[in-house]
């Protein structure tokens, strides 16, 4: 599985976990079927959950005029995934994480999601480089 596809599946699984409050393994199974689970997909899902408090704090400090809880569910999940990658995944360049997140937002979010995600993650990127 390519990383782009793993990100899409992770987004779908994390969305189910966030909105439907289902266990991570069940959510991953829902999006992958009964096949073997890609290690990057599994890493994204479980590590975003594990680091959620730190990720959310970083997002809150970079959201202007928004509360994280008021951000659209799909956008919030995309922001969490990308922030996790930018902060914790060393083998993925920050610019790749940001670009992938914008593409996911354009595909799965509404017409404003791409620019919103880009704006927030650009601030997160700057904060992480300090």
Curated annotation (Swiss-Prot):
GO-annotated biological processes: DNA-templated transcription termination; transcription antitermination
InterPro entries: NusB-like_sf, NusB_fam, NusB_RsmB_TIM44
Alphabetically ordered keywords of this record: RNA-binding, Transcription, Transcription antitermination, Transcription regulation
SUPFAM superfamilies hit by this protein: NusB-like
GO molecular function: RNA binding
Recorded superkingdom: Bacteria
GO CC field: cytosol
Disulfide bridge positions per record: none
Transit peptide among keywords: no
Primary role: Involved in transcription antitermination. Required for transcription of ribosomal RNA (rRNA) genes. Binds specifically to the boxA antiterminator sequence of the ribosomal RNA (rrn) operons.
Family of this protein: Belongs to the NusB family.
Name under which the protein is recorded: Transcription antitermination protein NusB
Gene (name only): nusB
């Amino acid at each position: 599985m390519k990383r782009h596809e793993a990100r899409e599946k992770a987004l779908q699984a994390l969305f189910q976990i966030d909105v439907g409050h289902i266990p991570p393994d069940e959510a991953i199974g829902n999006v992958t079927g009964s096949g073997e689970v890609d290690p990057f997909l599994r890493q994204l899902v479980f590590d975003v959950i594990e680091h959620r408090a730190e990720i959310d704090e970083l997002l809150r400090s970079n959201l202007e005029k928004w509360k994280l809880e008021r951000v659209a569910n799909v956008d919030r999940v995309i922001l969490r995934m990308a922030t996790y990658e930018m902060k914790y995944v060393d083998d993925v360049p920050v610019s790749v994480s940001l670009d992938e997140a914008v593409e996911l937002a354009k595909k799965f979010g509404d017409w404003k999601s791409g620019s919103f995600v880009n704006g927030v993650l650009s601030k997160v990127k700057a904060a992480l480089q300090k």
